[in-house]
Amino acid sequence: MKIIDGNIASPLGFSADGLHAGFKKRKKDFGWIVSEVPASVAGVYTTNKVIAAPLIVTRESVKKAQKMQALVVNSGVANSCTGLQGMEDAYTMQKWTATKLKIAPELVGVASTGVIGDLMPMDTLQKGLSKLVVNGNSDDFAQAILTTDTKVKTVAVTEQFGRDEVTMAGVAKGSGMIHPNMATMLAFITCDAVISSETLQLALSQNVETTFNQITVDGDTSTNDMVLVLSNGCTLNKEILPDTPEFDKFSAMLHFVMQELAKKIAKDGEGATKLIEVEVINAPNSLDACMMAKSVVGSSLVKTAIFGEDPNWGRILAAVGYAGVDVPVDNIDIYLADIPVMLASSPVDFDEEDMQDVMRADTIKIIVDLHAGDSVGKAWGCDLSYDYVKINALYRT
């Protein structure tokens, strides 16, 4: 697998565009992804019981058509908790896009992100849609879907399948309200491989638990968020089927893209200054390892200690203890980077200057060794700073 300098339109047969329509005061806030042909599609969606209108419409269309040819996204207005009018507006957003592209409405996905409770300004939507073009500036799409994010989040890779080169690209937004189960964010992945929607869904579902479901910024789960994967077959490779080496290679490719996007989201948490990576090793099973890793990275006390560059391993141990995992606690090792701070559940003296260098880094790695099996789990998050409160206190102003 090779990482390339690309964007969401790097796979064959895809294009994208993004622009400022007026959902936000100044920044780009509206965009689309378009495939030359209907693409196989797979999706996972928010587990919040309150579900935004665009997500309902998109999920319904994916189930009905089993294909998707276009995806249109706005940022600044979530169209969530907007009642029957919100549903009507989401269907209209879908219909208007389909009409412009001259395709069936059920082949259009819609997504929105932003302030909950505000109705969609349909005149703004119509104006923005009139300006979007096929084969526009694909890099602008990554900008158009952002809200409180400080940077775009993209990744693109290629992989050989026999004589054919398959390209896969991903883009995501997410900075706050990140505690997925799915994943609290929007993420879109495009690919040019020949693969059915059913097989694509299998690959996505297998990989979401160890990627997007293992990030947390603030413990909040949004109402709008989803991951969609589109693969249009333009490479004309031999079809990728389940339980084959080609499927395993494709799944590994997808896992890499999803994990990279997940890490970029965690690193760009609102007000964040550091990425936190927690790895639990030698656990009884992978589920327990992932639960424990996410417990540690989600601890507010661990997050604030990391922000303060304080190697407070007691907070890490406490988060291990309340993770809900039944493991012996009398033989646990904890490391910050490669420095042991606890061995066999007993504190260890460490060099303060070496530890200061570790804690000043942009990425803090915490390793928890349970000595209770051979499974591994990882989770990602960020520190909790003064700016997180400031950003969210002033979000609507």
Curated annotation (Swiss-Prot):
Transmembrane segments: none annotated. It is found in: Cytoplasm. The record marks 183-184 as: Cleavage. Keywords: Acyltransferase, Amino-acid biosynthesis, Arginine biosynthesis, Autocatalytic cleavage, Cytoplasm, Multifunctional enzyme, Transferase. GO terms for cellular component: cytoplasm. CDD domains: OAT. Its EC number is 2.3.1.35, 2.3.1.1. This is Arginine biosynthesis bifunctional protein ArgJ. It comes from Streptococcus mutans serotype c (strain ATCC 700610 / UA159).
